[in-house]
């Protein structure tokens, strides 16, 4: 698995227009916190069950990607959920998986707030919300 910070991910996506960009956060995060334009929403788990099913996730990504050879870029809130999700895709046979380090909102600062240290939005990259 490759690990790219948000700005490097933006460059990667422009250089790999065929890459599947997946937001694996819960639907409420995706819709109301915001997301990059064009990202495909495939949750790693969903409320209220909160059950991780790596086989289901890999099958959904494979269906959306049209196979396992297309590069897959994974985004979550802070870059933590993408690690086990990326490992699941690699175990399922995906050839190129990219983890967006720091995710969409970034790491917590000293006051337990996100979006002040790093992350997709912090870096000023394109995003939208409902």
Where are these regions (language model features)?
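Conserved G/P- and acidic residue-centered "switch" motifs that form tight phosphate/ATP-binding loops
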Residues: 79
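Rhodanese-like catalytic fold shared by cysteine-dependent sulfurtransferases
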Residues: 1-20, 27-71, 82-130
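Short, surface-exposed ligand- or partner-binding patches at beta-edge/loop junctions that are enriched
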Residues: 74-75
């Amino acid at each position: 698995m490759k690990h790219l910070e948000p700005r490097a991910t933006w460059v990667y996506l422009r250089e790999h227009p065929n890459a599947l960009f997946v937001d694996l956060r819960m639907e409420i995060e995706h819709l109301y916190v915001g997301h990059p334009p064009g990202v495909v929403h495939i949750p790693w788990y969903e409320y209220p069950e909160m059950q991780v099913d790596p086989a289901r996730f890999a099958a959904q990504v494979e269906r959306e990607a049209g196979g396992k050879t297309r590069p897959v870029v994974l985004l979550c809130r802070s870059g933590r959920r993408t690690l086990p999700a990326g490992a699941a895709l690699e175990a399922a046979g995906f050839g190129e998986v990219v983890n967006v380090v720091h995710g969409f909102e970034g790491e917590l600062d000293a006051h337990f707030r996100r979006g002040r240290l790093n992350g997709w939005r912090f870096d000023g990259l394109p995003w939208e919300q409902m």
